[in-house]
């Protein structure tokens, strides 16, 4: 096993039955019970416990990477790891990330017991001792019976340590203490790693974010650097080399989707102007709300309207609000009559069967998508309150339906009830020479991946709460409640490129299968063969093992038979 990566080694141990998949009681009992641990999260905890306490090739100080798909619950795993490390004597933690938005969201998840996304139980108790989680500025005056966490951006951490102030964190804080560094969206600390070879001056003198982190990390042999990300760029030669003995757990988006923990993605292109395209998404979004309500499920779908620039986003916000306020039957009828996708026809037919007139629908949309239920998150100076609003869109008392943004929400946005994304520009940036997916398209695919977190619901206890249920039931109206729609202008080349990007990140499967069909030569000369489509039935073996008695229709039927006497 010496030539294998750490992740491969641990996988071999698990497959050989040497590592049981189990979670310690002090983790289970102290996490919020409404967040039921999933099998892959249990495996992550088991891997971590093994490496920390039993793996004889463990290096000290220890650096480990949890490479987990967007939406797979990395932060919950992080919370469980903190509890586990407290039980093993660790008290001081530094949580750092690239974005201040994620800092505020994480503080809310870790510290605010009233938050709907609070990660811990109401009371925390380890070894019959109640403990508290506290935010601190430094560790010198922190209570060493508490879980003490410094929250900082990477840039802020670098600045605080290299330009020290009174009562602030300093390098001296780490000299005699065991520190756990928790890095969320950890791919950002690899800025220097990707440079490859550096000049002598760079090696000796550059103060960087990555350098600051490593200086803290190496100050004590018992320190831990735990990285969490969905996009570590493991294929980059320098990054792959760096993480060869550090990658602890790899649960990619492809497997996450295959295990049915994500929404399915649908691409909907239309020959409509920007407002009409957004309106079509509004109609679809409202239909989905009605399907939820019909099935007595209290979920409010929201939508994201994505512009290319902040100026365009602000301008369209005004256009959208005015368009909804002045909505007419003619505009909605245009959406209906020009629809090229069956889902739009299905929606309007549903409204007809439910006796929802166009006039009544307009009144609904004017109320549900009014200006006070739309929010723009484009400014660098957005308030903390605004950040918390967009991270609590699932809350019952949060009535926002439409979010307008450029790239403010590209990382750290973990809203579950996002069901529609509207692309409000038509450009594409494919690398025509190499045939590679362009950077913009790839970032859009990654945004779709973040938006495809599954919004949990079930009709009864026989159904899984956190997984898709209707993949094979294509006529079920609830299927649309397990789908994320991405709305764009009609641009086949862009859609083709986006599909390619989604396949690369694992959000769409490649379903090309070659089949050999034998047809008569005479059939090859027909228009059907030249221009039509051939369908091949898939045979499924019916083993009849679940049949224990005659069908009721046979048992209850009265059979008449005449006998000769």
Annotated model-derived regions:
Residues 58-81:
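Walker A/P-loop
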Residues 90-96:
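Conserved catalytic segments around the Walker B and adjacent sensor/switch elements
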Residues 64-67, 94, 304:
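Short hydrophobic/aromatic beta-strand immediately N-terminal to the Walker A/P-loop
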Residues 96, 182-183:
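Generic enzyme active-site microenvironment
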Residues 71, 97-98, 229-230, 407:
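Conserved H-loop
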Residues 2-12, 31, 46, 88-90, ...:
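Helicase-associated low-complexity regulatory tails and linkers flanking the ATPase motor
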Residues 20-34:
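Conserved adenine-nucleotide phosphate-binding loops and their immediately adjacent elements
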Residues 34-60:
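N-terminal pre-P-loop "Q-motif" helix
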């Amino acid at each position: 096993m010496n030539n294998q990566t750490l992740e491969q080694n641990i996988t071999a141990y698990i497959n050989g039955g040497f590592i049981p998949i189990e979670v310690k009681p002090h983790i289970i009992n102290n996490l919020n019970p409404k967040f039921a641990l999933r099998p892959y999260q249990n495996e992550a905890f088991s891997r971590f416990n093994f490496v920390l306490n039993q793996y004889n090739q463990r290096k000290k100080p220890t650096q480990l990477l949890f490479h987990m798909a967007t939406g797979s619950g990395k932060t919950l795993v992080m919370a469980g790891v903190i509890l586990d490390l407290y039980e093993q004597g660790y008290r001081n933690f530094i949580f750092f990330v690239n974005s201040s938005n994620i800092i505020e969201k994480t503080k809310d998840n870790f510290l605010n017991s009233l938050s709907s996304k609070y990660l811990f139980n109401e009371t925390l108790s380890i070894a019959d001792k109640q403990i508290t989680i506290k935010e601190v500025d430094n560790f010198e005056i922190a209570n060493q019976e508490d879980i003490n966490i410094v929250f900082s951006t990477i840039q802020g951490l670098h600045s605080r340590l290299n330009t020290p102030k009174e009562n602030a964190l300093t390098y001296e804080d780490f000299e005699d203490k065991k520190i756990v560094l928790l890095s969320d969206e950890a791919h950002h600390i690899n800025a220097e790693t990707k440079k490859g070879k550096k000049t002598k001056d760079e090696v000796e003198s550059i103060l960087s974010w990555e350098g600051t982190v490593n200086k803290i990390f190496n100050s004590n042999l018992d320190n831990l650097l735990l990285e969490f990300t969905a996009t570590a760029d493991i294929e980059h030669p320098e990054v792959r080399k760096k993480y060869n003995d550090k990658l602890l757990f790899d649960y990619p988006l492809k497997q996450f989707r295959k295990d049915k923990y994500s929404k399915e993605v649908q691409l909907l292109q239309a020959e409509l102007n920007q407002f009409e395209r957004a309106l079509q998404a509004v109609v679809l979004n409202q239909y989905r709300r009605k399907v939820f309500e019909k099935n007595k499920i209290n979920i409010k779908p929201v939508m994201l309207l994505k512009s290319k620039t902040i100026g365009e986003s602000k301008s369209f916000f005004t256009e959208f609000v005015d368009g909804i306020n002045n909505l007419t039957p003619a505009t909605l009828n245009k959406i209906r009559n020009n629809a090229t996708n069956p889902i739009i026809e299905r929606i309007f037919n549903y409204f007809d069967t439910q006796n929802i007139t166009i006039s009544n629908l307009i009144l609904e949309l004017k109320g549900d998508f009014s200006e006070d239920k739309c929010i723009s998150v484009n400014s660098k100076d957005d308030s903390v309150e605004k950040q918390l609003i967009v991270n609590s869109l699932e809350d019952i008392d949060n009535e926002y339906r439409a979010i307008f943004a450029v790239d403010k929400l590209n990382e750290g946005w973990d809203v579950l009830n996002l069901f529609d994304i509207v692309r409000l520009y038509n450009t594409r940036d494919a690398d025509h020479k190499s045939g590679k997916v362009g950077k913009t398209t790839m970032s859009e695919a990654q945004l779709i991946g973040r938006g495809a977190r599954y919004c949990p619901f079930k009709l009864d206890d026989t159904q899984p709460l956190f997984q898709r249920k209707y993949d094979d039931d294509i006529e079920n109206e609830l299927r649309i409640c397990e789908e994320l729609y991405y709305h764009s202008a009609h641009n086949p080349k862009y859609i083709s490129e986006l599909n390619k990007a989604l396949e690369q990140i694992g959000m769409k499967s490649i379903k090309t299968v070659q089949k050999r069909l034998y047809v008569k030569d005479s059939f090859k000369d027909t228009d059907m063969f030249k221009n039509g489509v051939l369908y091949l039935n898939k045979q499924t073996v019916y083993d009849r093992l679940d049949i224990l008695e005659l069908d009721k229709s046979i048992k209850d039927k009265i059979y008449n038979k005449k006998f000769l006497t």
